[in-house]
Amino acid sequence: MAGNKRKRSNASEGSDSQGNERISSLSANEATQDFPRGGASSLTPLEYKEAVLEAKKDFMESASGTAELSKKTRPKKKGSKKSSKSELDNEENLKVHIQSLRYKNITPGSLILGQIAQINTLDLAVSLPNCLTGYVPITNISDKLSDRLDSIDNHAEDNAATEEEDGLNQIPDLMDLYKVGQWVRVSVTALGSENTTKTGKRHIELSLKPQDANGSAPEAADFVAGSMIQAVVSSIEDHGIVFDIGINNYTGFLSKKHINDFPFVEGQSLLCSVISKEDRIFHLSLTATSTKALEVMPSVQAILPGDYINVLVTDIKESGVIAKYMGVVDVTSDIYHSSPVKGEDLEDKFQLAKSVPARVLFVIPGDPPKIAVSFLPHVLTFNFATPNTPHPDQLDIGFIVNAAKVTYVSSSLGVFCDVGVPEISGFAHISRLSDKKVAGISPNSGPYKVDSTHEARIINYSYVDNLYILSFQQSVLNQQFLRIEDIEVGQFVDGTIAKLIPQGIVVTISEGINGLVPSTHMADIALQFPERRFKVGSSVKCRVLSTNVLRKRVLLTLKKSLLNTDLPLIYDYEQATPGTQTVGTLARIFEDGAIVEFYNSVRAFLPVSEMSEAYIRDAREHFKVGQTLSVTIVSCDPENRKMRVGCREQSWDAKRLERFENIKAGSVLSGIVLQKTEDSVIVDLGDKVTGVITLGQLCDGDLNKCSKVMNKLRASTKLAEVLVLRKDTSKKLISLSLKKSLVEAAKENRMPINITDLKEGIKYFGFVRNATTFGVFVEFCDGLVALVPKAYISEEYVPVPSAVYKPQQSVTCVCLSVELSQEKAFMSFKPLAQKQEKAVEFMESKYDIDNPVDETIKKTYDYVAGKITWAVVTSAKASQLNVDLAANVHGRVDVSEVFDNFGEIVDPNKPLKRFHKGDKIRVRVLGIHDSRNHKFLPISHRVSPKQFLELSVRPSILNMEPFSMKEPQFKKGDEVTGFVNNVSKECVWVSLTPSVNGRIPILDLTTDVKELNSLQKHFFLGKAIKCYVVNAEDSITLSAIGPLQGFENLTPGSRLVGKVTNVNEAGAILQLPGHMSGRVSRIDMFDDYDILPETKFTRNNLVGVCVLSVDVPNRKVALSARNSRTQSQPVEIKDKEINSVDDLKIGDICRGFVCNVANQGLFVTIGHNLIARVKIGELFDTFIKDWKPHFHVNQLVKGSIVGIDNDSKRIEMSLKQSKIKDSSEITKTFADIAVGSNLDGTVVKVGDYGVLIRIDGTDNIVGLCHKSEIADAVVLNISKLYSSGDKVRAHVLDVDSEKRRIALGLKSSYFDSDSDISMSDNEEDVEMRSEDQSDTSESEVGSKDDVQSEEVENLESAGDEDEEEEPSALQANGFDWTDGSTVFDKLADDTEDSEDEEDEEPKRKKSKSDRFDDEEKDLDEIPSTAADFERQLLSSPNSSLLWISYMAYHLNLNELQEAREVGKRALSTINYREEDEKLNVWMALLNLEVAYGTEDSLKEVFKEACAYCDALIVYEKLCGILIKGGKVDLADEYMQLMLKNFKQVPSVWIQYATFLLNNDKAEKAHGLLERSLQSLPKSEHVGIIEKFAILEFKNGDPERGRTIFEGLLSSYPKRLDLWNVLIDMEMKQDDPSIVRRLFQRLLALNLSTKKAKFAFKKWLAYEKNIGDDEGAEQVKRRAIEYVSESHSEN
């Protein structure tokens, strides 16, 4: 670059002195900095830019002058012409031209910033700069979307029938992927015409694929923070979106916090902003992450459309602005994008040499590339994924602007106009100014000068340019339609026939808009030769049926019935109102109706019953598709887009409606025949009310006689007597009959209308409704039907009733019986054996009454609803009174029908206590009590002695006049009285009335937990409960503790009962009455913090609580379960309740739970919203550098209050033992410590000199154990043996009373002489073992460290070491720490093999393993104290057995969290090579969480275990643990996960199938085989099928196993191994016949001699085993025959 600048200075020697001075100084400066140090320039940026501009100007002037001089004076020489041309080219190349995007200068590979203007079915229309439009085919959006389209295409070819059923096999809707106005970066892929004709429009094909839109060969280095990048949604994850950015080995990631509810779809291509780059991941955003422009790009190729950059203005012209980026890259902005105000003087807006922000608009490839930028505000500030907000005054396309004022004229482009919309201008291209050719335009003269006004029409809108595209052409102004959106449904349009096609007629409506007249809409009748009636080029008047903007389709009609109708048009479901009459076209016809189509694809269903007044059997026989009908809307459901119409007259006047209402079924009327159809007669009954007589109802004879009657009838024939059979009020249909037998019966009032009219033993006239195999159905009036059973049809046997009795046939029958409760009646065609009168008398005798209590009652049917009578109590039960109304009439009084309100009840536990046997009581009859179903039934027929009466003695019922049987209506908040009738675990059911029950949830029963824990004892049958209605919509829900339970009704101090729904170490969530929930924090669970939550708070447990506070707006309730809060009697409080700072004073000792472990210290919750801070210096009496491992969240700590700030409510706390110890806790003083004694202590510091130990039970007395006294062997690294916080036992070596110093020793030899180990104060109840069982010799520690590296090397070189056998029952409180023996234990079958291998190991290896014999003995005998465990772990840190035993030790002490911590320590301590040892610890942790943890904690441990161990083994082990623990459902979930993640492993399928079959889920297991075959390779198919078959034999259905094996053998008949397995399975089924058949089939195959010998030998062994000697002999004979036959063949 320095060389170039020196060249420029030399070329400008002829310029003015000032310019020379500047250039020379710049050159001198550059000459001194060819190799600058640090890259800093001595010029300021502004001075540097001014110098560059001045140098460029002088160079251009000098170059121009030299060229002119050489051209005039230099003589022509050979080659001078070429030289001159080269100089002109150089001069032209130096000029920077303002780039506008035109079709001519676009090349494939050009990158452009655009906005989506239109979304079509198969492509996107993208608005480009300079009023251009390009199209992105659906195949150019992304590779992922293209692959999906390919799969859809392949699926359609394979199985077209299922394509509609599978939603995944439908073409994606681009409307779900993009929005109009959304910004995108596109790459030009092809240029051409939409069709091959000369008038074809220019077509620009674009691509949104990242590999195209991010440059030809995008590299990761080209994108920096703030760069724009086009990315494709690759997958949608829980934490964000993964993108494909088109760069190999790099991906993009959009965090969930940057999503902002944007709808993401896989395969979607979006424009994003780069936030940062980490490793191979670009962090993206959909919004601008910074308002700061990009100052520097990695390279020129990195500049892409959409990038927000700062450019330096170098030149301002009338047509635009020229600028530089980074001082070397030329960029331009044309008049479209230089200023939003067209006609504005650009020199007033831009200043030379000033840096301004701009956004890159397009990049056209070249050398150098042509780069354009935009300064328009809406381009600078856009959001990438969401469209810009439309202008509130935006005009529609097609709108005519009466006075568009010209504001700027571009002689080469056109004119810019003010259309009256702020911030949006209009632009009319020069070709759109007039229908005639415009030679030229000028801003100062002519018809299109500045400030001239014109009538203009908006023909489009350019999103990127923010311009309306205008046309001044008169032809466009006069054009009726510009777009399909301008065409209204139902509108009349004039068009010209363009062509005739098989589907119909294509009509040109306007320029570029065609419509189709379907063949069914050419005329009201079907045309065989439409070309004779319609000629191409002729004008037609049409009506618009529907429009589809997306598919660009307009449907028209030429039907005269639709063109000339004056009826209202239906083009929207919302517009359709019942009763409206309109015209429609039949689109489809079915047997039971038809689909009628109106305008805008609105459709309705026309039932066959609404097609005509006459009966129509099949609509297809009377109507044709395309037929026009006048219909009336019957009903419409706009929400579900359903409509029902009818052809029958729907509008009835009052007189006609009154006539219809007065006609009753069973009445006899007169009428006049209106018309006849093929099989019916329509009769006028007066006032335009009509009825229908079907053919079979014309007479009592058969169909032939009925047809003769039909032939005699004529229109206007008077019918004197017709019977009304049925009346359908909803359809306004009346069915009539002319059968004389029915008419006469109706006239004599012997025609039954409802089932109560039927009397047993009475003869009735009817007609056959239907004949079936079991009897004949007889119909009477109003649809009443009775059954004649097959046995009562005739005296003779009738095998097929339908052969004798035909529909509509007249019959006479006798009533056998009537079942009113089931509304059934039975008839007989047989004659009565006795006279009818005797039969009636016999029937009446059934209702005789015997010795009634009320002597006014004569018959049982005198007991009707509302009857007040007397009854005698026979027994008083808990929930009802049993009474007698007569000797043969009984009843009951339900307890809910005794009292009017709860106040009348003397003893709620025994409400019926005042009633005694023999009491005579006044009762009122309510109905019938169905004792079988325990239901209340109203009285709808005569009461018989067999029925049980439902009675009432409630005063309000006895005094009710007039009596009404209306059920009481319950509403929310009502006070009611309920009587217990049933008790379940979740609720108590109470009776409110004999027929209405209510439900009281268990939490709404009482606030006494004891009562709820023994429901049956306190809520027994019949108990009265005062309740309040909570919900009465679907079922009645009640509450016995208050009227309306809600957050507003809760008050602090209220005592409730809650049901535990979730519990963890921080607290518990409880369900409260009234569907509320509350939280009990850890400090509010107990008055003693030592009690674990699990002792009281387990899921579904009931707990008494007290309300502490209620946050009504946020629906939060704080609760307390402390006994001091929930119980009235005083209780012992160990940890007092602290409610405010006022409850504390400095020096108070209190306990709390750690809520945060921060870098500054601990934060401890000690009360309600009270958190105390513990500084690091207040944690321990001595300094401990790594203090965090000593604390964890929810840990219980004890401390002393050292500071209180009442104003800020801040509390300071100290955990130092010296500040919180009571005098009673200090058991030793300095004087009590004697030389030679053994003491327990805690390591407080480890240094090079030794270990500092704080002695337990003292006032912070610390002793020193010198490094020489740590172990009997030399210890090189003390920190490997001890760390701060370790519990140790030390021997006192020396005591210096003056200096208060104590010398201690930790050597194991100091403890050898002790025959009895003293116990610490806190371990008095723990039985200690003798010295040879409890302590591992400390001398072993040093020796093992010395040989550790040697042993590791030997182990690695020798291969696998002997495996330790896992303990089978390391238990704590009955808890098995191992995974036990399950179907997933892969090593179970190899135990004996491994033992054999151990015996064969070389002696060298065995001698090496002998080194660990002592350690094994120690591990087998588990230590008893934490100190013992810590000592042994020093010598055996890799022993999983010891670590698990340590966990069990803590669990025995109910220290659940400590057990977890030990497990975590074990995982971090055990050497990474000891994979089996680590796996054992993981299994122990999983066992722990399964037994004591939650599902969330189990899931967390499981995920960690999968990350560090073989995931498949962890899955199998966990499933085995869950199965053994009885958690089958959870095991099923994890098995399904295992199957999903390891579906290529055959054993996983077998394990899951085994589990399902063992747990009675055979149907689910049967589907696994087919699924496994789809996932496993073909080489595994035979094996997996065989194993599934074996499973069926062992655990499932043996028959299914046989079927599977038979399928295998049909494919592999000579696979002896398959035959062998099948025979083995059948041998276990104990059916010798099946086994023998299998052997016979096997030997019938062409087997080799060796295979046949094997088969005979196996068969013979089987016969001997089952003890069948004859069978064995037969096998031998068969073998001899087989051998002889084989020899003869050979």
From Swiss-Prot:
CDD domains: S1_Rrp5_repeat_hs11_sc8, S1_Rrp5_repeat_hs12_sc9, S1_Rrp5_repeat_hs1_sc1, S1_Rrp5_repeat_hs2_sc2, S1_Rrp5_repeat_hs5, S1_Rrp5_repeat_hs6_sc5, S1_Rrp5_repeat_hs8_sc7, S1_Rrp5_repeat_sc10. Residues 1-42, 59-90, 1313-1424 are annotated as: Disordered. Disulfide bonds: none annotated. This is rRNA biogenesis protein rrp5. The modification Phosphoserine is found at S1394, S1684, S1686. It is found in: Nucleus, Nucleolus. The gene is rrp5. Residues 1348-1367, 1390-1400, 1412-1421 have a biased composition (Acidic residues).
